């Protein structure tokens, strides 16, 4: 992501009252509310065909051991270096798969957010709890 794109993102987050430009920090409660209740409407996923990629949503590391799923239920961000076959799932931003492979915590957080975008009630409930814990710990 270029510096100008990052600046634009911070500006939009400030306008949406998700970021405090004076303290230069995200507003945790507002961010939590948006992630839990708004992200699935603002960023609905595009579901595609079977492809190779990086597991996401409830098949990503934070949730993969909590739920039983069939091989047909694996969702992946399409990526040539991906190690798993699954149903194509659009990332929030095109460079996310590349960045997520380099940062374990970011990958975990994005997998939880994707669960909120796609998951069923039990998966969403656990993803909410883990994401809120992650936000509190990193606040």
Regions found by a protein language model. Give the residues of each.
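A short structural micro-motif
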Residues: 16, 133-137
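Short amphipathic alpha-helical interaction segments
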Residues: 2-15
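Generic structural hydrophobic/aromatic packing signal, biased to beta-strands
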Residues: 13, 21-22, 77, 127
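Short, solvent-exposed secondary-structure capping/transition elements
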Residues: 5-7, 22, 124-125
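Exposed, interaction-prone assembly regions rather than primary DNA-binding/catalytic cores
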Residues: 43-132
